Amino acid sequence: MCIRDSEAFGTDTFDEMYQKYENAYSVPKKKISARELITDLLKERAETGRIYIMNIDHSNTHSSFLDKVNMSNLCQEITLPTDPIQHIDGEGEIALCILSAINVGVVKDEELEEICDLAVRGLEELIDYQEYPVKAAEMSTLARRSLGIGYIGLAHYLAKNRVKYSDQSAWSLVHELTEKFQYYLLKSSNKIAKEKGACDYFDRTKYAQGILPIDTYKKDVDEIVKPEYNMDWEELRANILTNGLRHSTLTAQMPSESSSVTSNATNGIEPPRDYLSVKKSKKGTLKQIVPQYSHLKSAYTLLWDMPDNTGYINVVAVMQKFFDQGISGNWSYNPENYDNNEVPVSVMARDLLNTYKYGWKTSYYQNTMDGKVEDVITDPNSAMNDYIPPLTHTDNEEDCDACAI
């Protein structure tokens, strides 16, 4: 396969080109069993936890870009077009992470639209304010103005609503939340475009053609939650066609470990590993309790209590339906749930196929409980006495300005 043809990877013409070379007798070939290849991938991922997976086809079909997405970043949530540079002042494209996260665990429903608007406007100013040491990064960022706004505190949000990750009601709740989230972010970008003009590369997005995430998602997600909407997407579509968008993308779900700690929120979209955890960093250790522990202890989904990944996969799939970039989604396994304390390859294969079927663009870490206890406190009742008074939310705390984002 020549370089020119390899550039078709991820596009509609790739399958046709691949079959052409596959059928050509003059092209040397080496066959490997697909089952063997996938098994090797899954075993290596299980052993290292760090073989990341990107579904490049869906990363493009469900992208907001007409330009091809070739790759993701280390954390697997950024799916932006890139183009190589030959020297430091080259005119390729370097994609940057312009990120923010909203603590959905403490945001009231009536506040969400305003907070989404503030997040978009804050990052909008940051794009123009920051310095760019590399020309290719500056040109691409200023022209595309791609943002990645996501969640922290999703586990807290679900616990407040008394639903578990494995509940059908949780998937419906996340569908409702994420629909509003993406809608309000797009609405804000559309308003800013009316004020300042659309981004320079707006015509290189599917949004410019009136195509929205609800048009391009994997329709298998409808098996999880019916495609019923509460927002006026057709009005938004018309407004985008009229005034454009200031930003090529609005959403991405980052790991958000650090920001979750500083906000005393649960980590991103992840179930907590325990009620009281020890967070470690270069600056030392910090004990962190889940929000509203006294009131919501029984409502939280703990990571290692989940029997499998099904509920979590469905939550991420529903989010990805609306997100225009990617999601740092993890696979997690408790060997105690399986015979001989060993996670079968068949279980991992099922999760691989389900993440693909339900539209995951990328898969980040694979976590396996190893029985170590230094990172969590397994008996929080006695250990948390010194932490509950200052850290646990009260019934009135939602009205406290200090807790607002």
Question: Which stretches of residues belong to each language-model region?
Answer:
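Conserved small/polar residues in nucleotide/adenosyl-binding loops
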Residues: M1-D5
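Structural signal for hydrophobic packing residues in well-ordered secondary-structure cores
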Residues: E22-Y25, L41-A46, N103-V106, L112, ...
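Structured secondary-structure scaffolds
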Residues: S26-H58, D399
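Alpha-helix capping and helix-loop boundary segments enriched in small/acidic/polar residues
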Residues: P28-I32, L42, L66, H87-G90, ...
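Function-dense linear segments that define catalytic or interfacial modules
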Residues: R45-T141, S146, Y151-N161, A265-G268, ...
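Catalytic alpha/beta core of large soluble enzyme barrels
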Residues: Q76-T82, Q86, L123, I127-D128, ...
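Internal maturation/activation junctions in enzymes
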Residues: C116-E138, K164-S256, S328
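Short acidic, low-complexity intrinsically disordered linear motifs used
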Residues: P389-I405
